[in-house]
Amino acid sequence: MLEGRILADFRQTDASLHQGRPQSSSNSSVPGAPNRVSFAKLREPLEVPGLLDVQTDSFEWLIGSQRWRESAAQRGDATPVGGLEEVLYELSPIEDFSGSMSLSFSDPRFDEVKAPVDECKDKDMTYAAPLFVTAEFINNNTGEIKSQTVFMGGFPMMTEKGTFIINGTERVVVSQLVRSPGVYFDETIDKSTDKLLHSVKVIPSRGAWLEFDVDKRDTVGVRIDRKRRQPVTVLLKALGWSNEQIHERFGFSEIMMGTLEKDNTAGTDEALLDIYRKLRPGEPPTKESAQTLLENLFFKEKRYDLARVGRYKVNKKLGLNAGQPITSSTLTEEDVVATIEYLVRLHEGQTAMTAPGGVEVPVETDDIDHFGNRRLRTVGELIQNQIRVGMSRMERVVRERMTTQDVEAITPQTLINIRPVVAAIKEFFGTSQLSQFMDQNNPLSGLTHKRRLSALGPGGLSRERAGLEVRDVHPSHYGRMCPIETPEGPNIGLIGSLSVYARVNPFGFIETPYRKVVDGVVSDEIHYLTADEEDRHVVAQANSPIDAQGRFVEPRVLVRRKAGEVEYVPSSEVDYMDVSPRQMVSVATAMIPFLEHDDANRALMGANMQRQAVPLVRSEAPLVGTGMELRAAIDAGDVVVADKAGVIEEVSADYITVMADDGTRHTYRMRKFARSNHGTCANQSPIVDAGERVEAGQVIADGPCTQNGEMALGKNLLVAIMPWEGHNYEDAIILSNRLVEEDVLTSIHIEEHEIDARDTKLGAEEITRDIPNVSDEVLADLDERGIVRIGAEVRDGDILVGKVTPKGETELTPEERLLRAIFGEKAREVRDTSLKVPHGESGKVIGIRVFSREDDDELPAGVNELVRVYVAQKRKISDGDKLAGRHGNKGVIGKILPAEDMPFLPDGTPVDIILNTHGVPRRMNIGQILETHLGWVAKSGWNIDVANGVPEWAGKLPENLLSAQPDSIVSTPVFDGAQEAELQGLLSATLPNRDGEVLVDGDGKAKLFDGRSGEPFPYPVTVGYMYIMKLHHLVDDKIHARSTGPYSMITQQPLGGKAQFGGQRFGEMECWAMQAYGAAYTLQELLTIKSDDTVGRVKVYEAIVKGENIPEPGIPESFKVLLKELQSLCLNVEVLSSDGAAIELREGEDEDLERAAANLGINLSRNESASVEDLA
């Protein structure tokens, strides 16, 4: 399947296109796209593939969709088998213990999805389609066949965006990087003798491991299923080999002959018994049971599975069955023998081996971190494995029912129990480490999440055990996994991102495209190569100069060979050439302009921080982009794209109607102010007008973080790079107040608050406006149902939904019984359990959803009514918020200055933001400075003087780049962007402003004036436009102070953390500091009445209220806990006063305490189970 590698063929007849001038607009392939002027010098022969294909293609294989079958037919696969079909074929037939009955499954198919995506999100449903299979029951005694269509449960379906909706939340299944099944040879040095030792592992997809090794005494041994080692000849004899046959095959090897001599087993029977004793110690061995055990371990499909990929890897490594289709996935005798021969030859230092079929294969050890030996389990395979688990559980049930039910009455329906299958699927989507809550901070974060590769998860590595080698960048990652984008913490190197052009082949190996080179001529024929195929070839880089006919200009070309070796070779030796300079990086990394000038550590932070940018009220595309913005935004799926060409018939904020050329009318609904998974605001707005013509694939509405269909994560701000009075020391940032007043960096955040009314033992809870002991002022914004009105401004402690819960009843007095008789249930005691705005939050109510059992809404058991309230908060930029550029340059806002105090340019324009110069040199992210210069050039526009011919520095620029209007948007693709000389030339050629002045000199610096004194600064300052993003680390979410709050149940100390409305811990080291200052009374106060002296803290409150002196502290609760723990160890501990008298710790203080607290209106019953709403 891997042999037919040519998957795309882009031959172009016009020779001038081969190198010539590239198209100057980086967005030219998408209709209606903004005209972004590109500095790219190279033409890319291949469009960026669909960025979600890794998810959608895999799921289509699983369900066996029509589109997948067509693409499989194009690949030359005559009989494609989908993932579900594969599981059913493996499972069928299920036979009973006597073999008289069998049940087989076939033809999986789906009905329509029960509800659309929006309804599933709204009503907490799973976006799923009913799965049906054809089940056939055969009675082998009578030949009777009963066939039925059986329902196998709801099967979660993938949305168009590559996500799943599970119980109303959007989730992503992350692809898993695992070691491929196959045969792996390893080399180690013995510590005592310094001899080279060799070993080999045969690793299956499912089943027992088989390991061979050569030890320091030069004997070849085998370990079966990780049990004790024994001579390898024992296994060969057990497989039926005689001494003569072993001599004939391995006569060339002294170590094999030596092993045979030391082997005491006489023949096959004795060898089998010997193996049985090692595998099943303590059980009486017989020849038959030993034979069955060995066969079941390696040669039976039910117990041992190499999988197609493992079979392919074994065949390739050992040179077996070359060119033949893969049929079996178990081990064969020839595999075992060839593996032993390969190991022996490797140990003896040979470099090649002739396989039984006559194929010569190289003899070498394997690199386990090589991408030829690591494969991807994509979403389809992960779900398939889970279904396989569920089906095997169901198989046991079917077998049992076959033996217990009456043969005449049996039908497929009565045998099958679908519960294990449904449970397995549910468990995977709900709790698996690889099924993750989708990152919806902005469109880029969602797109990156779907393209993520994780080495963690079931069957993968654990972050504690993973060493440096597996985390490191490997030469085989080139074009497959991005070397830049990975997390910074303990998961570094274990989680990666798929490169832009990479794709996954049917075996799960990642392929990357290359242009074929024939006799030194580069063609536009594209070959996709896996990592081990690439090792056999010589590859030139994308920017190797070629002429109009595609020939290399230089006689010697810089290339890379196996294991990342780089050297110059004659052009005739080159086999392939990269398709694009950005081939090696991921989508987020490809959106960093001037990446080639940034240190890799800072580029990593830049790629990661783009995913943390929050959508702003008004998005603005970058002046300096990379040409990746449009494709990333479209493939992320948050913009609206026209399906067909036509004319816009009607436009409003809520929908767009298009009259297509074929006469059909299509209405696209806009998503308005919806809440994303991360509380950001997802809003779509049209960018077309009525009567406008649109083409298929054109963006007609922007989503969050997009402008005109391009990704727009931040704002273009006028930046000055200079120290300013020490206020921007250590990465602090100074902002202009203009950004606050004009809502430049303002974002909207939406919180969802939910409450349900349940049936309790004491009666049903009720959502009502009639709440006990609450004033009318508090209820002013509630409607007659007790639910807050839309548009109400709310702050912490305000009631959103009124709810009362029945209290536990005591024995009623006669008067109460009389009241109950007169007023019925109304006089029952209830307590206020209303939904209130959590501490520290405020905003405007923008939406309410009410679900009720009376309206036939699906609700969990015991819930009668469910209310959701959406509160939106407009957050202006403020001190303490985190801002970042795209080059890993991040900082916290230290000061917001009035615009008139900011440094200003000679024409009076104040800068928006001041960054410190010290943040650049040691971090080596010079890309931010180049971006600042090019940003100024793009904003000002330029005109290159060509009166005396085109200057030398502009020789490679396309003609339309010789001049540009102000406010142009430009792209400088990674590794193929604007050069330093071009930047210097363009800075000297910028257009003057309306006063005829050129404000920034050719070195990119301007004369700045102090906004407070009006005096010029003593030195020129770098000024330009930089793209700045507001990150999700907002000060409003972090700042916190505790008043009266909950206490821990056991220690009675205040809880910690903002979510629990906790206090700040005064820890051991802080106590030392107090001791060092001799602040004894302060320390005593901190450890007693401010913490867990339960009596003291109430008395202190009372003293403060009455204006009296603070009383003496009591005994802390944690001291009493310590005593109890010591007493539980049978130690009699007494507390003595200074004069030696025993102090009695009274237990009965609680009642006095409660009484005193009640008089003061303090509630002491709050403990860790208390919810934050009860604290107001």
UniProtKB/Swiss-Prot annotation:
Keywords annotated in UniProt: DNA-directed RNA polymerase, Nucleotidyltransferase, Transcription, Transferase
EC number: 2.7.7.6
GO biological process terms held by the UniProt record: DNA-templated transcription
Enzyme class of the recorded protein, top EC level: transferase
InterPro entries, per the entry: DNA-dir_RNA_pol_bsu_ext_1_sf (IPR042107), DNA-dir_RNA_pol_bsu_external_1 (IPR019462), DNA-dir_RNA_pol_su2 (IPR015712), DNA-dir_RNAP_su2_dom (IPR007120), DNA-dir_RNAP_su2_hyb_sf (IPR037033), RNA_pol_bsu_bac (IPR010243), RNA_pol_bsu_CS (IPR007121), RNA_pol_bsu_protrusion (IPR007644)
GO molecular function terms attached to this record: DNA binding; DNA-directed RNA polymerase activity; ribonucleoside binding
Covalent S-S links between cysteines: none
Region feature Disordered, mapped onto this chain: 13-35
GO cellular component: DNA-directed RNA polymerase complex
Biased composition (Polar residues): 13-30
Reaction catalysis annotation: RNA(n) + a ribonucleoside 5'-triphosphate = RNA(n+1) + diphosphate
Function: DNA-dependent RNA polymerase catalyzes the transcription of DNA into RNA using the four ribonucleoside triphosphates as substrates.
Family named by the database record: Belongs to the RNA polymerase beta chain family.
NCBIfam families: PRK00405.1, rpoB
Assembly and binders: The RNAP catalytic core consists of 2 alpha, 1 beta, 1 beta' and 1 omega subunit. When a sigma factor is associated with the core the holoenzyme is formed, which can initiate transcription.
Name under which the protein is recorded: DNA-directed RNA polymerase subunit beta
